[in-house]
Structures are given as C-alpha cells and as structure tokens.
Amino acid sequence: MKKIRSHSIPLREKDFQRSVIEYAKMMGWRVYHTPPALTRSGRWITPVQGDVGFPDLILCRPPRLIIVELKRIGGKISPAQREWLSALQACTGVECYIWYPSDWEQILSVLSR
C-alpha cells in the first residue's frame, strides 16, 4: 500500500473528496463512490452490503485501477479498512493508496500518469 504525505492543507474530508473526484474526472478517470447516509439515530452508514471498511473511491482508467481511502488531517485507518486495502493490494495490477489533504501534489502526479 502506498502512503504519500507532504505539507498540511486544512480541508474537511468531504471537500478533499470532492476535489479528488473532480480532478480524477478531469483526467479521464471513471469514478465510483458510495456516499454515507445519516440514519434516524444520528449514525452514519454506507447503504450497501458487504464487509465494513471498504475504501472510499474506485478509480478506473484502463489499464489502471486505483483504490483509495481518503482521510482528513489526523484521521486514522481502521483495522477493517487496512484489511480491505491489504486484500485489494494483493490483486494483480491494483494500486491502493491512503490519501490525506497534505498529499495533494502526489495525488495530482498519480492521477495524471
């Protein structure tokens, strides 16, 4: 799993995510993201079936497939997220990343290749 970090940029995760998605689309990537939903009890869930911890973004621009977990500054990867990323990284040809807002320059580089 490639983890890239540089200087800090103060962004909320949803703003960061929107920026990554916009840039990816601008560079010709197909983007998949399932947004979380707020339940009546005030809990956030992702309304899909599957094991918990699935990464935030799937980016496809043949021949490349990128799987991304996005984190806010100071955000931590959960054990379930780490398990998913490890399993996906073991698949041939899949690139997996954990990106923080401070990684912006490297994100631009990865998505522009």
Tell what function each PLM region has.
Residues M1-R113:
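Catalytic phosphate/metal-binding cores of nucleic-acid and nucleotide-processing enzymes, i.e., regions
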